[in-house]
Amino acid sequence: MDVAALVSGGVDSSVVVHRLCEEGYKPAIFYIRIGMEDKDGYIDCPAEEDIELTTLIARRYGCPFEVVDLHKEYWERVVSYTVETVRRGLTPNPDMMCNKLIKFGCFEERWGYQFDRIATGHYATTDLLNGKTYLSTAKDPVKDQTDFLAQINFAQISKLMFPIGHLLKSEVRAIANAAGLPSAKRKDSQGICFLGKIDYNDFIERYLGKKEGRIIELETGKVIGRHQGYWFHTIGQRKGLGLSGGPWFVVKKDIKRNIILVSRGYDPDAQYGKTIEMETFDFITEDAYEAGYWNREDATPVTFKIRHTPEFTRGLLYKGEKGYRLESEERIQGIAPGQYCVIYDEDHHLCYGSGMITKGR
């Protein structure tokens, strides 16, 4: 079986190569270059260091290695999506789009199609049910990344391998140390993948500029401050508001009038909601309603996430004529339109897919 391994130079993907070779595979290693390299001088994440470490891994295990450039495609599909989503006053998820459109989209179209399987360092697993592959959660609940993979499709999940999905992060580090891998002590990457060391607000300002507006207290209607543009702020945000007498939280945004509405206190009611609405829902493996596993006339018990966190929340999913509605068992903070609601089974093991949040209340 021919296997392609997507390797970033970090400890996780390095251990992927180690484990594949231990199991008798000789994977072809690919490093995907995607980052901030344009005419104005924005620089990628530390790509040269990544490539150097990946080269060492490839040489050590005698694997073919190729650097593939998907920078143009990344800008066109992921960065442009991020900027446009923010412009509309919504909350983007570029990491989900990168997995769907770049790592398992463009790469597959240009290189991956030559291979039987594609292995990555994601913390996730797969289950085979009724002859079909399902995305499943990882052994390590803190590192689990199924929420970042919840926009991929059946063709993509059927081809993926997650060699470290059944390991804890501590076990991955231990394997890397025992094997003497050059990335064993390397820190995990943080933040949005294409930004590297660039400040998020600096990036947004570069494309959307500044536009001063009012910050208004939701309960009183009183103007309590100024902001530089609604696009710099997200629902649930607490830091960076420049307000005294807090804590203050962003609870609403008036896009047309460029107004940020805030509320004071650790958990004011205005921050929380129990209902999530989605116009569409993308199942990964198969539509559970069409397959007959779920009945659209009944509420379906599920667990879900609306942000990257180890915790799952229980709720009931409804399918109606105009979309999907999720009723949470408990109030949840910061339901942000534009973000994705990721749906799991009741045991939060199988990941069914995700839908973009259109409204929360």
UniProtKB/Swiss-Prot annotation:
GO biological process: tRNA modification
Keyword tRNA-binding in record: yes
Family stated for the protein in its record: Belongs to the MnmA/TRMU family.
Naturally occurring in which organism (per UniProt): Porphyromonas gingivalis (strain ATCC BAA-308 / W83)
Name recorded for this polypeptide: tRNA-specific 2-thiouridylase MnmA
Active site: 98 (nucleophile), 193 (cysteine persulfide intermediate)
Signal peptide annotation: none
Enzyme class label: transferase
Catalyses which reaction(s): S-sulfanyl-L-cysteinyl-[protein] + uridine(34) in tRNA + AH2 + ATP = 2-thiouridine(34) in tRNA + L-cysteinyl-[protein] + A + AMP + diphosphate + H(+)
UniProt-annotated site: Interaction with tRNA, residues: 122, 339
Keywords recorded for this protein, A-Z: ATP-binding, Cytoplasm, Disulfide bond, Nucleotide-binding, RNA-binding, Transferase, tRNA processing, tRNA-binding
Primary location class: cytoplasm
Biological role: Catalyzes the 2-thiolation of uridine at the wobble position (U34) of tRNA, leading to the formation of s(2)U34.
Subcellular location: Cytoplasm
Annotated positions binding ATP: 6-13, 32, 121
Disulphide linkage map: 98-193
Stretches the record annotates as Interaction with target base in tRNA: 93-95
Recorded GO MF terms: ATP binding; tRNA binding; tRNA-uridine 2-sulfurtransferase activity
Taxonomic lineage: Bacteria, Pseudomonadati, Bacteroidota, Bacteroidia, Bacteroidales
GO CC annotations on file: cytoplasm
